[in-house]
Structures are given as C-alpha cells and as structure tokens.
Amino acid sequence: MSTKFLIAILLLLLSSPLAHSQNQFVTTHGKQFLTPDGKPLILRGMNLGNWLVPEGYMFKFKTANSPRLIETVINQLVGEDEARGFWKTYRDNYITREDIHLLKKLGFNSVRIPFNYRLFISADDPTKLEGDGYQLLDRVVKWCKQEGLYVILDMHAAPGGQTGDNIDDSFGYPFLFESNDSQELTVKIWQKIATTFQNEPTVLGYDLLNEPIATHFDANYFNPKLEPVYRKIVSGIRMVDKNHIVFLGGAQWDGNFKVFGPPFDDKLAYTFHKYWFTVNQEAIQEYLDFRDKYNVPVWMGESGENTDEWMSSYRTLLEKHDLGWCFWPYKKVDATSCVASVNRPADWDEVVNFANNPRSTFEEVRKARPAKEKINNALGAFLENIKLANCRLNRGYLNALGVGQAIE
C-alpha cells in the first residue's frame, strides 16, 4: 500500500463528520479542560438548584425538605389534579430563556442542572423511560446553546437514593448501592440522556451522582461500592456517547477522593463540593494533590450559602489555582445568598406554617390546612414571583463571584 494512499485515507478520516463532530466538544487534556479550538477553559458557573429538584429551605420550609415531602405539601393543599398544574407552571416559570440570557450577560460561562430521575420515567411504570425531564433538558440546553453557555447535567436524585438524605429525594438510605435494579435504571436513564445529547457540544459533560454516601452511614461498608457503580454508569454511557466528559464526585458529600483509584476513562474529570469552612490553602490541598497525582481536571461543582465576603475569598482561592467553579444556587425565596431572590408572596407564611406543622394524621392535615382562598392566593402569587422579571438581583452576591459588571 503506497504512502500517498495512506495519507489520502488519513485526510479522509480527519475530514469525516465524526472527526468534525468530536472537534466541536470541550475535552480534557491533562489537568485542563480545553475548548474546541484548544484553549484552556476555566469554568465559572451557577447551579440551577430548586428547579428540577425542589429543596425545602429554598421555599422557607423546614421539615418538608425533599421533593417528595414538598410534593405532599402541595397535594394536601390543593389535591393531585391542581398540584400537577402547579408543578408544570413552576417548571415553566422558574427557569426561562430570560434566566439563561441573564446568566450569560452577568459573565457566567456555564450552568449545572440538578435533576431528579423521577422526571425521566413513567409514574405508572418505572421501566418506561418516559417523562417531562427529557423535554425540559432539551429546552434549556437549546437556550444555553443560543446564549453560549456550557451545560453540566447532574443526577441529583438517583434511583434508590445515592446520598440517603433529603437532597437525593430518597427514603433516608443510599439504597442505590445495594440494589441492582436501581443501578440498572440509573444506567438506562443516563444512556437515554447521553443518546439525546451525544452530538450536542453545548453539553460539556455528565455529573453522574451528586454527593453520594452521606456521612451518616458506614463509610467502610459503602465507599468501596462507589467506584464500581461509577464504572457501570460510564460503561453504559460510552456505548452511545464517546464525546462528553464524565464527572465523578467523591464520597461523603462529594468531598472524599480517597475512594478513587487511577482514572478508568480518557474523558474523566473529578468534582468536589465544599461548604462552611475556613478558607485557606489547606482546605483544598487534597484536591490539588489529586489533580497533580493523576494529571486530571478537578472542578468545584458546588459551594455557597455563606456571606459575600466568604464567597469572594473562596472564589479567589479557587481561581488562584485554576480551579473552575459552580456556586449554589441561582434562585430562592427571600434570600441574599443567590443570584435572584424570589419575593415572598402575601399569605406565603400560611403555606410555610402548614408545611412545618405536624401532618402525620388526617386530623392534623385538616386542622393545619389554611383557608382555600389563602392557599390559592399564596400559590398563585408564588408562581408569578418566581419569574425573573419579578425577582430582585443580589448585587453583593454577584460582586463576590466577580460577575455582573455588565448589569447596572
């Protein structure tokens, strides 16, 4: 076979649609993320928390703190039929094209989108991969593509529960690691999501499991189970998608990287979360050491819920070490530690009191339920107030993250 012929074949392969497609994606190179044109990419992102995984504290609820418990509150207030309408409007209003446009204008270059697996299966038959989640992700990814924001998709609540707390919408135990059925469903959902976005470069990567294995549980028992589950999910994704980066979070709230061996895929990145600590070099040294040891990208995928001064100090430390970041959260009720604060509606305290009162018996539910007029007023106003046009921006929060200079 002649040299000219081999060169011709090589040029043909390099010019093929597949090669062209792969060159459109952010990839990894050593410790860095690289843009399609080969430039280093430092992620400056925002978590769209409370949209597809509601959390009680962002509603000002205390005991109703997981999606299931919050859904129960709304069901008990208005019934299942009206509740379905409430959640549809909630998801349509909470994150819109205007929100994505704002984030880009503020100076962010990426968003992390936490999602609940229940939005990706049939409520009647969990083996059917049908649900509103696919359309919701497709819509927001298209907005991000139009605005020029990268997207990291985050399975915040996995089948069976990967954390064993309110944030994973579980029943208080990380059953995922003991259930083959839950693991298989997790793989299938990720496969379908990966199939959907396999050729979409706006999606930067997949954050497989948010904050697996809470500190409440026996780490010696659970931690050895984590990487095998990750390997199973990655293997499933790679059957349909070899383009995207896969993010692995450590055990114990994404903080413990000792569970990891050497990287087992050529497009792996590792993500840590860190809240409520004294900001200094020592606090992040283990993640820097891990990055150096394995020559892989490391990304700070969540932090926040603190003072503006603390946020600024932490963000500066991360940037000093070329660590990309994604702070938490974008929007919540009546708060300063977010980009956009939702104004508390009139009569909202009636809803909050109902959510916080004992409701373990039908009698307690009846006694706690506010008047129908107050319920309707509060929920209706809430659905209007979550629209960006009705929110207020927190200038101190934006300044702390070094963004927002384009907004007067």
Region locations from a protein language model:
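N-terminal secretory signal peptides that target proteins for export/translocation
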Residues: 1-2
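Boundary at the C-terminal end of the N-terminal hydrophobic targeting segment
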Residues: 19-21
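Extracellular glycoside hydrolase catalytic/binding regions
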Residues: 25-26, 184-332, 337-355
